[in-house]
């Protein structure tokens, strides 16, 4: 092989560059190919062709993209907690079905989809399948603008034809931003996440809910970021060949997509029946690679009362044939397809397993059962202060419970009736009975809760029987929560309408008066008796009624007012002040202390998840509001509650609710009561924020939440 030759100019450039980088020169560096007009033309055609292919493929799917915004409800801390999540989806039917991930819509209560033409319309959940992490929404086509043409629909391709090295595009709305596309290649068509052993790693959304057990992902390096989940993976033919589900950025972009063949099958079943029915056997399978066997698949574990155990199979058996067809699982990548094949058998069908036990070959005829949910339904019992879960078979087995009867305590709200009971309810307790009512399911507990809270006079206590760690215990719970009280107010005391800061020795020396330590007046509150006295900002208060005031540190910032509070209201105080190097005595009439924001009366609206308080003297002074400015101040908005979703913020001054002017707490409560009774689709809040007014549009969902009927909340 001959060594390539360099031109003299090229050698000079190469030598200088290499010397700068490493101080050495390689004489055998490859020669840069000369860019001839022919090569330049070919490269330009290739770029144009690739750009055209990408553009054509993009335009096949981009119009069918949907940005999904989800209002979620989860149960934690003994109460219902709302939140928001975003994701992407693909319109797959002219009827408005949108394919996305289960984890995008998980715990969803309300769904909004933004289409390619910027229209935002509502959607409802058709069905979800946690085990494959897939879900289907259906757009409310009645909300489309008049004149809108037929929906753009993406075409699902054949994921079995995908090969390593294929060029693909990931589409979606990363970080809830506008639609985007990223380009990459397929790295692996049969990716699973394996544990350190020889079996697939089990992925879970929480302790109870598994996912991805039937999936072998398409791995690619097109960038996936939060918000891309549920979006399509597209080939250069403009076909959806996967649903982007997970992404990793360390070590280069790694994206994982559910193959379109899996997604199409699941979506079809969800649209037809609202669920994916699967057969259950009660076995766990493992590859035989390390077992010494040459064929078959190992029964790694078995559910003692499951269909497989009832047919005679045991842990340690090696299955060699299923319905007469030989089966061998050597690698972990072969486990998900086998599990999928078994699960896809019709529920109730008989499946013949040929297996080896020791030196014997045996046969088991397994009648499949319907695979149940991993995790039960949830509800919060607000007045009692806890959230509960229905118990599924899988949950009972994982917790070693005798049965699925009862309701599992998922969480307890601190300070609630359940928390203050003796003994208190705890996470993991199983409620079996309330007074004379047996509790077999969440439905039973909801019925008892609603019936109890509908009583005109609530009982003082409820007797609750529950199991904890195999022991049956009882406790008493107050069905009526303690009424929330306004913050305690200090008894009226003497006050001077000034704000001050301590003047310590170093500051006094810097001011040129080392002996004048005390309290510098930072504000004289207008419309107070102090404003009528000869007091000015910058005065340093040295003494009160002849007693010298010497602050020891910033912690003594309240010393002056504490001394004043010891005096009689409506009396008079003599303040010795330093001003311009001279000392003066100023007589100030005392008045009553003003209510602070922390002492202000409050109103908690549980429907809108909004807390407001009355306007205080100090609020008016801080915001420079005169007496004509009326309303109530937003003290707190719960995350993702109706108020927060409508744009209300802490610090807003609510001046109008709908058609009702708000002048204080009384008129605010009356306005909110009328709104709650009328249940309008939209409630307009007019608020003063900063220097201007803002109109905030709140869209309540007036449908009652399961287990949330609570009459005492408004008391």
Cite the ranges covered by each PLM segment.
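Bacterial N-terminal signal peptides
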Residues: 12-22
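C-terminal soluble interaction/assembly domains
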Residues: 439, 445-447, 623-626, 635-683, ...
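C-terminal accessory/binding modules appended to enzymatic or scaffolding proteins
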Residues: 389-399, 403-415, 610-645, 650-654
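Short, low-complexity, Pro/Ser/Thr/Gly-rich segments in the mature regions of secreted, periplasmic
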Residues: 696-715
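Conserved catalytic motifs of ABC-family nucleotide-binding domains
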Residues: 316, 428, 538, 651
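Serine-dependent protease modules
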Residues: 28-315, 321-350, 356-394, 404, ...
């Amino acid at each position: 092989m001959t060594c390539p030759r360099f031109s003299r100019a090229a050698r000079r450039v190469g030598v200088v560059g290499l010397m700068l980088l490493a101080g050495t020169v390689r004489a055998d560096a490859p020669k840069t190919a000369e860019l001839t007009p022919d090569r330049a033309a070919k490269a330009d055609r290739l770029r144009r062709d690739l750009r055209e292919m990408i553009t054509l493929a993009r335009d096949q799917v981009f119009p069918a993209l949907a940005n999904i915004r989800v209002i979620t409800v989860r149960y934690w801390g003994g109460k219902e907690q709302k939140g928001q999540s975003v994701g992407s989806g693909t319109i797959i039917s002219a009827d408005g079905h949108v394919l996305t991930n289960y984890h995008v819509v998980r715990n969803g209560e309300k769904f909004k989809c933004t289409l390619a033409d910027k229209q935002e319309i509502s959607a409802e959940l058709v069905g979800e399948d946690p085990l494959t992490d897939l879900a289907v929404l259906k757009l409310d086509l009645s909300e489309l603008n008049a004149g809108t043409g037929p929906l753009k629909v993406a075409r699902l391709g054949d994921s079995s034809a995908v090969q390593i090295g294929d060029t693909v595009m990931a589409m979606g709305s990363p970080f809830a931003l506008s639609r985007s596309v990223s380009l990459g290649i397929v790295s692996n068509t049969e990716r699973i996440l394996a544990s350190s052993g020889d079996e697939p790693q089990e992925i879970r959304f929480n302790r109870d809910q598994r996912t991805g057990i039937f999936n072998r992902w398409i791995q690619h390096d097109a960038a996936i970021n939060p918000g891309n989940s549920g979006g399509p993976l597209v080939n250069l033919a403009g076909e959806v060949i996967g649903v982007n589900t997970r992404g990793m950025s360390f070590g280069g972009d790694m994206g994982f997509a559910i193959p379109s063949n899996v997604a199409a099958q699941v979506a079809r079943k969800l649209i037809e029946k609202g669920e994916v029915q699967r057969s259950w056997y009660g076995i766990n399978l493992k590859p035989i690679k390390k077992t010494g066997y040459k064929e078959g698949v190992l029964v790694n574990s078995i559910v003692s009362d499951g269909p497989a155990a009832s047919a005679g199979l045991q842990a340690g058996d090696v299955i060699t044939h299923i319905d007469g067809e030989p089966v061998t699982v050597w690698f972990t990548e072969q486990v998900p397809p086998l599990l999928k094949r078994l699960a896809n058998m019709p529920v109730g069908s008989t499946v013949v397993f040929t297996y080896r036990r020791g030196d014997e070959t045996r046969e088991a005829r397994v009648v499949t059962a319907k695979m149940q949910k991993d995790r039960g339904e949830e509800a919060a019992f607000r007045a009692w202060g806890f959230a509960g879960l229905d118990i599924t078979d899988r949950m009972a087995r994982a917790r070693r419970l005798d049965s699925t009867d009862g309701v599992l305590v998922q969480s307890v709200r601190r300070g609630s009736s359940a928390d203050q009971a003796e003994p208190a309810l705890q996470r993991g307790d199983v409620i079996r009975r309330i007074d004379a009512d047996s509790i077999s399911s969440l439905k039973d507990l909801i019925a008892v809760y609603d019936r109890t809270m509908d009583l005109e006079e609530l009982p003082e206590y409820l007797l609750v029987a529950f199991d904890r760690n195999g022991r049956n215990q009882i406790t008493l719970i107050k069905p009526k929560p303690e009424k929330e009280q306004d913050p305690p107010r200090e008894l009226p005391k003497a006050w001077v309408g000034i704000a001050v800061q301590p003047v310590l020795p170093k500051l006094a020396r810097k001011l040129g008066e080392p002996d004048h330590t005390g309290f510098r007046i930072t504000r004289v509150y207008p419309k107070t008796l102090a404003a009528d006295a000869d007091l000015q900002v910058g005065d340093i208060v040295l003494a009160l009624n002849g007693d010298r005031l010497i602050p020891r540190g910033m912690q003594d910032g309240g010393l002056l007012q504490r001394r004043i509070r010891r005096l009689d209201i409506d009396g008079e105080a003599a303040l010795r002040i330093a001003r311009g190097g001279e000392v003066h005595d100023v007589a100030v009439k005392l008045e009553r202390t003003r209510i602070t924001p922390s002492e202000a009366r409050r109103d908690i609206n549980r429907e809108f998840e909004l807390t407001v308080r009355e306007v205080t003297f100090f609020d008016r002074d801080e915001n420079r509001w005169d007496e004509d400015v009326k309303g109530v101040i937003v003290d707190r908005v719960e995350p993702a509650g109706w108020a927060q979703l409508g744009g209300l913020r802490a610090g807003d001054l609510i001046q109008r609710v709908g058609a009702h002017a708000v002048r204080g707490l009384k008129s605010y409560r009356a306005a909110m009561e009328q709104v709650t009774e009328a249940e309008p689709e939209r409630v307009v809040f007019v608020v003063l924020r900063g220097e201007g007014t803002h109109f905030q549009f709140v869209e309540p969902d007036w449908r009652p939440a399961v287990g949330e009927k609570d009459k005492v909340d408004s008391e």
